[in-house]
Curated annotation (Swiss-Prot):
Coiled coil: none annotated. GO terms for biological process: DNA synthesis involved in DNA repair; double-strand break repair. Keywords: ATP-binding, Nucleotide-binding, Plasmid. ATP binds at G43, A44, N45, E46, S47, G48, K49, S50. This is Uncharacterized protein MJECL44. InterPro entries: AAA_GajA/Old/RecF-like (IPR041685), P-loop_NTPase (IPR027417). GO terms for molecular function: ATP binding.
Length: 331
């Protein structure tokens, strides 16, 4: 089995250097190190080579682990240790720093626009200096589909906390709690506007929604969870806890009394939207850098999470009957 990505290396932003796969299908643990432009896996039939491709393909999605991908010993029972450990750890080197910085800065500006935070250009310049320090990224993917990102300098020193401290300055030193409240208010205003409420009644309508037990009770539970952490270093854990609360909300509409009439709103849908926007505060900065893999099977048909254009398959015809894997990063 070949893993190959060569002639377009410099058009990519990231390059996979090593990966560890644990407890995926038949794989107990597999360490693949020193990955260059071409890597060759040699093994007998049914030795698990194809499961490496399947693992990397799953890694490039947001899906939780399920079906045949879960090892037999973990089926049919809750295993907390299994869910705590990452299924896949993958290290990537940044091979196009300019493109990396351009994409991250662009995404952060998008975040600031979405959450209505003014852009401080001087601080943004300092943040660009922070991006210059980053040379490697580590992505972890867990059985529930959760991703975590760790940031390293050229000496492989973990500078994730330094990154978040710098990021916090970019967003005007607001805490996760500040930002959740800001997003909550904005989403409720948008929902009220959809109901054709007059402009001069929007504030009162939002206050009525916030005071309704169907919203206020869930809101307070979420605030309690955020307060226990409330740092960007713990951002992923905060989002996971909020998600658990949102999942418990009934997916039904409730009647809300606002000035002049009653309206129907679905708390589950609204809190889901709030969680999505809240989660994007940090993750959107890296979301488009998450690797997605595509490969050719023995019949030379394209498989995987990303569909490549025909020029890729045409250049690989000479590799017939060989399984090829190409990570598709930022183009």
């Amino acid at each position: 089995m070949f893993i190959k990505w060569g002639d377009r290396l410099m058009t990519k932003t990231l390059h996979l250097t090593k990966v560890t796969i644990r407890n995926f299908r038949s794989i107990k643990v597999a360490h693949i190190n020193n990955i260059g432009d071409i890597a060759v896996f040699v093994g007998a039939n049914e030795s698990g080579k194809s499961n490496i491709l399947k693992a990397l393909n799953w890694f490039g999605t947001d899906k939780p682990l399920g079906g045949d991908d879960i090892p037999v010993e973990f089926l049919g029972k809750e295993n907390k240790e299994y869910s705590k450990k990452p299924i896949i750890e993958a290290y990537f080197e940044i091979v196009n720093k300019d493109k990396f910085k351009e994409k991250i800065i662009s995404n952060i500006k998008e975040i600031l626009e979405v959450i209505k935070v003014d852009i401080n250009e001087d601080i943004l310049i300092n943040f660009e200096d922070m991006l210059n320090k980053i040379q490697f990224l580590k992505f972890e993917k867990y059985a529930d589909g959760l991703f975590k990102t760790y940031i390293y300098d050229d000496q492989l020193e973990d500078i994730t906390k330094e990154f978040y401290d710098c990021f916090k300055n970019v967003i005007s030193k607001k805490t996760p709690l500040d930002l959740f409240n800001l997003i909550y208010e904005e989403v409720l205003k948008e929902e009220v506007k959809k109901q054709n409420i007059p402009e001069n009644q929007i504030s009162n309508a939002v206050a009525n929604i916030r005071g309704n037990p169907n919203f206020n009770n869930h809101y307070r539970k979420i605030l309690d969870e955020i307060r226990t952490l409330n740092t960007f270093e713990e951002f992923y854990e905060i989002c996971k806890r909020i998600e658990n609360i949102v999942k418990s909300i009934p997916n039904t509409s409730v009647s809300i009394s606002i000035p002049g009439r009653n309206i129907q709103l679905n708390p589950y849908n609204i809190f889901t939207e709030i969680l999505t926007k809240f989660n994007s505060i940090v993750t959107i900065a890296f979301i488009n850098l998450k690797p997605k893999f595509v490969y050719l099977d023995e019949e030379m048909e394209l498989k995987g999470a990303v569909i490549k254009n025909t020029s890729w398959s045409n250049t690989l015809k000479e590799e017939n009957k060989t399984t090829l894997l190409m990570p598709d990063f930022l183009e």
